[in-house]
């Protein structure tokens, strides 16, 4: 079975991991379809509609989908071919993914690539996924390289504001900074979100995010503030709805945040918020 539509920015976070549990055979067909697109385009799908990639979203989120399935041991996937596709899709530049820039600066500069903070955070996670697949296949040099790239999110952390912020290529922080400023798709450092919503996107290393925040107590306090601060500014994307403070239940970047209470001091608040 071949599939030709992959809304991956929307589905890699929860839908595809669920498919591996409920529909593993179909997940294999998804992945084989993605690899066929790699054979045609030279990189895996970004956001494919009816067989054509329209690049409307960021990230390279076929990678976590493929990595997740292989690490779960789902049979029927050629792991070596999959790794070839994953690695080349993380090194061959394509729309919204200028990897020569990524390697040079260790972040996406906003004056070179818009949506730079969101891309930096999401690509760092994709790189962590590449590293995990490389490790499973015994590719130690690749593992070390992509683990290093998975830490690039640190290069956009601004300690005095306590947020991930945009930099230009000269290393200067983009000013003025408003953590409530909402971005849509392009022309803003954040994709369908703001600095509050993207602060929590370091799924590959939550303990490190807690440390950046100042420890368990500060992390929990910031989570509380996230769910209670109602201020907004800038354009609101039509996908953003169901606000609980800064949490936007109507869009994907916020969906995991309530569960982060489980890493802090007040785990019961996960139940309250979710």
Regions found by a protein language model. Give the residues of each.
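Carboxylate/His-rich catalytic cores and anion/metal-binding grooves
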Residues: 21-34, 55-88, 154
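Surface-exposed beta-strand edges and their flanking turn/coil or helix-capping segments
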Residues: 43-46, 59, 178-180
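A conserved hydrophobic secondary-structure block that centers on an alpha-helix together
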Residues: 1-5, 11-17, 21-47, 119, ...
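Active-site core of glycosidic bond-cleaving carbohydrate-active enzymes
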Residues: 5-13, 63, 76-151, 155-274
């Amino acid at each position: 079975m071949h599939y030709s539509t992959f809304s991956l920015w929307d589905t890699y976070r929860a839908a595809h991991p669920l498919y591996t549990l409920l529909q593993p055979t179909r997940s294999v067909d998804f992945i084989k379809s993605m690899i066929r697109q790699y054979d045609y385009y030279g990189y895996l799908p970004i956001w494919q509609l009816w067989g054509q990639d329209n690049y409307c979203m960021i990230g390279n989120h076929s990678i976590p989908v493929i990595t997740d399935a292989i690490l779960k041991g789902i049979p029927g996937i050629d792991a070596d071919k999959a790794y070839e596709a994953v690695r080349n899709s993380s090194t061959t530049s394509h729309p919204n993914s200028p990897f020569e820039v990524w390697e040079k600066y260790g972040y996406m500069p906003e004056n070179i690539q818009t949506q730079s903070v969101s891309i930096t955070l999401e690509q760092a996670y994709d790189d962590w996924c590449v590293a995990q697949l490389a490790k499973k296949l015994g590719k130690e040099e690749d593992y070390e390289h992509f683990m290093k790239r998975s830490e690039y999110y640190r290069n956009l952390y601004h300690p005095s504001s306590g947020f991930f912020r945009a930099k230009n290529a000269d290393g200067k922080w983009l000013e003025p900074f408003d953590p409530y400023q909402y971005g849509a798709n392009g022309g803003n450092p954040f994709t369908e979100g703001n600095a509050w919503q993207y602060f929590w996107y370091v799924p590959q290393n939550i303990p490190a995010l807690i440390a950046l925040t100042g420890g368990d107590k500060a992390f929990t306090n910031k989570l509380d503030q996230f769910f209670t601060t109602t201020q907004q500014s800038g354009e609101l994307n039509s996908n953003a709805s169901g606000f609980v403070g800064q949490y936007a239940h109507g869009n994907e970047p916020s969906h995991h945040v309530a569960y982060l209470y489980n890493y802090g001091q007040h785990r019961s608040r996960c139940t309250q918020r979710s």
